[in-house]
């Protein structure tokens, strides 16, 4: 019923369950194939409680630039209630992101990510989207994508003062280190009507 639904939350193909007995029941159902092909692989992870944000990096194969961070709002209902969506709106800059946390993200996540791509000889130029969660002022990665996030792209690119074609040309030519990015310091927000 509703009580059970409140205790577990399905995020796309994930379940977040806060009671051991319910977790055992769901795991048993998965292992018995209740969810078809999706049940063939089950991953159990630590639950991280914090606030999410999105980090966007443009990487040219050698150099990288960090774009403005954004915070999206996934829940469909008012006051952050209801089921998760791809995003019902976003804001940039992120109100709770200070210089110290940004530096931790760059040192612990962005630099090792870029170095890993280089060390693995992965031929990649483009966007790196890093979904993060801030847990007591410590950043944790919850997902990577090689694209911009939606709806965050709308607020992030609105803040970029540079000509976007010039930025992408520098990315293609591996000259991101030769361009200074300029960002509007105003707050941008968007709302998805669904």
Per-region residue spans from a language model:
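Single conserved hydrophobic/aromatic residue that forms the stacking wall/gate
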Residues: 1-7, 11
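Solvent-exposed alpha-helices and their adjacent loops that cap or buttress functional pockets
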Residues: 8, 33-39, 46-50, 57-61, ...
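Generic preference for hydrophobic
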Residues: 9-10, 44, 66, 191
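Beta-strand scaffold of nucleotide-dependent catalytic cores
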Residues: 15, 25-30, 45, 52-81, ...
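Conserved ATP-binding module of the ATP-grasp superfamily
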Residues: 16-54, 111-120
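ATP-dependent carboxylate/phosphate-activation module, predominantly the ATP-grasp catalytic core
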Residues: 57, 63-109, 145-160
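Active-site "cap" helix and flanking loop/linker of ATP-utilizing ligase/carboxylase catalytic domains
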Residues: 106-128, 145-194
């Amino acid at each position: 019923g509703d009580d059970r639904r409140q205790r577990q939350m399905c995020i796309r193909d994930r379940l977040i369950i806060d009671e051991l007995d319910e977790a055992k029941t769901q795991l048993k159902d998965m292992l018995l194939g209740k969810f078809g092909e999706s049940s063939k692989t089950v991953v159990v992870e630590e639950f991280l409680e914090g606030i999410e944000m999105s980090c966007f990096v443009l990487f040219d194969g050698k150099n990288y630039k960090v774009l403005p961070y954004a915070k999206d709002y996934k829940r469909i209902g008012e006051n952050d209630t209801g089921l998760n969506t791809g995003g019902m709106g976003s804001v940039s800059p992120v109100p709770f992101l200070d210089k110290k946390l940004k530096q931790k993200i760059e040192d612990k996540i962005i630099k090792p990510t870029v170095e890993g791509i280089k060390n693995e000889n992965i031929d990649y130029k483009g966007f790196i989207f890093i979904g993060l969660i801030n847990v007591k002022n410590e950043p944790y990665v919850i997902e990577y994508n090689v694209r911009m996030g939606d709806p965050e792209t709308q607020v992030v690119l609105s803040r970029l003062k540079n000509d976007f074609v010039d930025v992408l040309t520098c990315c293609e030519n591996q000259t991101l280190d030769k361009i200074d990015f300029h960002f509007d310091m105003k707050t941008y927000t968007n709302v998805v009507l669904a």
